[in-house]
Amino acid sequence: MAHILGIDLGTTNSCMAVIEGGQPVVIPNAEGFRTTPSVVAFTKTGERLVGHAAKRQAITNPERTIISIKRDMGTNRRIKIDDKEYSPEEISAMILMKLKADAEAYLGEKITQAVITVPAYFTDSQRQATKNAGRIAGLEVLRIINEPTAAALAYGLDKEGHQKIMVYDLGGGTFDVSILEIGEGVIEVLATSGNNRLGGDDFDQRIIDYIADEFMKEHGIDLRKDKVALQRLKDAAERAKIELSSALQTTINLPFITADANGPKHIDMVLTRAKFEELIKDLVEKTREPVETALSDAKLTPEQIDKVILVGGSTRIPYVQEFVKKLTGKEPFKGINPDECVAIGAAIQAGVLGGQVKDILLLDVTPLSLGIETLGGVFTKIIERNTTIPTRKSQIFTTAADGQTQVEIHVLQGERPLAKDNKTLGRFILDGIPPAPRGVPQIEVTFDIDANGIVHVSAKDLGTGREQKITITSQTHLSEEEIQRAIKEAEMYAEQDRKRKELIETRNKADSIIYQTEKLLRDLGDKMTATEKEQIEAKLKALKDVMNGEDKERIERAIDELTKSFYDVSTRLYQQGYTQAGPQGGTNPGGQGGTDGNVNTDYKVY
């Protein structure tokens, strides 16, 4: 059976895993790393880079490098590169395509299905955007699950007995907290809360601002206005943050960060852990309220929590760990990898859906209340937050005016009492209502939330049976036509990437035979006939002339011609008692010696 890929699509880094032999296994990317930077870049020559390659060139190409795109999922932001605009879904799809391709190379099979995680506090529009990104990347997204829930799956897979756990998930761009009950193969989410714009990126920004402000005081230059300098600051801030998790101080050294009339300027400063903690104190404090809300919604006290699990790279910060310990009165559990456990949980859920993992039932919840706008601009809730999903609930409404023949259903998500203060998910019209005095028609509004947390709404006039149904899509979403266009472009990009990789491999092969041929000419050129030497040099020049071109077939023909001449000459020299290693990647024309087995030589053909 084909593998279903479990994907943690993170703000800063992404990770993937599958079930192998009944157990979750993290898949390394093509570069050999277990996590992949969620970074996309476009070079000035039009090449697209994803992951480590994109991150490495960010300093020299900041304007064409896209980071933390997850924060823009579900919005109408567009990223303009040259004369083309990209949606957040399309950029996220590029990251997913990289993960998909690397997983296929690792597993040796085609991947078509995935389970993707999202922050528990993601809205419906953000979940829809994530699902669309999967489609564009060529993945059927079987399930969208919440990150803290995935972490709990990773933790609870082999646990016996009943436990109430808190998952404190502080990643690169989002914060979630979930309270769950685990026992007898059932993982039930009791409550969830969070902040979709709080994470390690914000910690980095505090360091950036601190360095820039100190530099401004000393030199009167604001480095934040210089895009290349700012990117260097971002890299330095991230490194400093990571180093301060294990060291009490770190040195930030950025030579030639800028220059003025007096010459080049450098940064060489020490950042202590104490100063870093002072810079981020108020940001960490912002996690207190969601934790208290989740506990309150779950009707539990900190004392009733058996285990606190830390998830997300930002929980490696000692100050965060100490804050959680003081807040909950519990020493946080550090027995799972905070960078990988969400992907592992996604793989377990994929295993459940694929039938590879048995006896696990996951009961998740909707993070925010859902309802509609009613008379006076009031938000009337139909499904309360922390309701177990999938779920379906209905409520009867009526008209607000005499003779009203249609009603607009304004669908909202949030917790504020007034409609204008909540997130609009969509609007639709139910018409054809027979004229009647206000308050007489009965209109049944039904909310249906599927296991992905995606909302479907219907409105039905009980008098006529007339009904309207929609799956919520807000104006920030890509239309079906736009999604199909993006899918075609993604397939085109994948084909371009494949051809590019083949071209690079062919050039590498050419480079190898050029090196071997030049070595042969240096070492044994005086043993060749004039004709042999002339032929090899001509074919060597022909290969050098074409190897940096874009025509792969032409390069391959030149390789074949040079290889043939190389072997013709080297075989003759070998038979005369000379030795020379053949070019890598060529076809072995001979063996290890003569047929009598008495020739003993170091001649090799790779």
Curated annotation (Swiss-Prot):
Positions modified as Phosphothreonine? T174
| Induction of expression | By stress conditions e.g. heat shock.
| A UniProt-annotated Pfam family | HSP70
Q: Does the keyword Nucleotide-binding apply?
A: yes
Which CDD domains would you find in this protein's record? ASKHA_NBD_HSP70_DnaK-like
Q: Which InterPro entries match?
A: ATPase_NBD, Chaperone_DnaK, Heat_shock_70_CS, HSP70_C_sf, HSP70_peptide-bd_sf, Hsp_70_fam
What molecular functions are annotated in GO for this chain? ATP binding; ATP-dependent protein folding chaperone; unfolded protein binding
Q: Which keywords accompany this UniProt record? A: ATP-binding, Chaperone, Nucleotide-binding, Phosphoprotein, Stress response
* Region ranges (Disordered): 578-606
Spell out the SUPFAM superfamilies in the cross-references: Actin-like ATPase domain, Heat shock protein 70kD (HSP70), C-terminal subdomain, Heat shock protein 70kD (HSP70), peptide-binding domain
Q: In the UniProt record, does the keyword tRNA processing occur?
A: no
Q: Where is the composition biased (Gly residues)?
A: 583-596
Q: Which family does it belong to?
A: Belongs to the heat shock protein 70 family.
Role summary: Acts as a chaperone.
Q: What's the protein name?
A: Chaperone protein DnaK
Organism classification: Bacteria, Bacillati, Bacillota, Bacillota incertae sedis, Caldicellulosiruptorales
